[in-house]
Design a protein with these regions (language model features):
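Class I SAM-dependent methyltransferase Rossmann-like catalytic core
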Residues: 46-73, 77
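Conserved SAM-binding loop of SAM-dependent methyltransferases across substrates and taxa
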Residues: 96-109
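Conserved SAM-binding loop
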Residues: 126-127
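Conserved SAM/SAH-binding beta-strand->alpha-helix loop
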Residues: 119
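Conserved SAM-binding strand-loop segment of SAM-dependent methyltransferases
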Residues: 131
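Short beta-strand element of Class I
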Residues: 111-114
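N-terminal auxiliary segments of SAM/dcSAM-dependent transferases
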Residues: 1-45
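Conserved class I S-adenosyl-L-methionine
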Residues: 85-95
């Protein structure tokens, strides 16, 4: 992550760059399919995020909101326990890593991080965004 920009700004910049590399029709198709999956019956036999286009579309339309929601919750926790800082972070079902960005925004500094998800494209994209 860029040490001179806030995690929120760095995330926004990374997502913009990712979208610049995805053809608009491909992004629109992926977003539409993802919306249908989330509004309908989500298949449980295979990851919803099947490929790079799906992961990018998901990151573009969901990651900022997820980041802000998790950051708000973590900020409340930090305000309640100001002397506590996590020694590490594990995110089960973490996808592209929005919660990890929220942890960094709330408690700056390095710590061990593990993000687990069955959608390899989401994990790969999360690593790319963080690089």
């Amino acid at each position: 992550m860029n040490e001179h920009a806030s995690p929120s700004e760095t995330l926004r910049t990374a997502l913009t760059a990712l979208l610049d590399g995805l053809p608009p029709k491909q992004a629109a198709g992926a977003v539409e399919r993802l919306i249908e999956n989330y509004r309908g019956t989500t298949p449980t036999h295979t990851p919803v995020l099947r490929d790079q286009a799906d992961a990018t579309a998901y990151a573009a339309y969901r990651m900022p909101a997820t980041f802000e929601a998790v950051r708000a919750a973590l900020t409340a926790l930090a305000d309640t326990a100001p002397d506590w800082t996590p020694a590490g972070h594990t995110d089960v079902g973490g996808g592209t890593g929005a919660a990890t960005w929220a942890v960094t925004a709330t408690w700056p500094g390095s710590r061990p991080v593990t993000v687990l998800d069955w959608a390899d494209p989401a994990l790969a994209l999360g690593r790319e965004i963080a690089a």
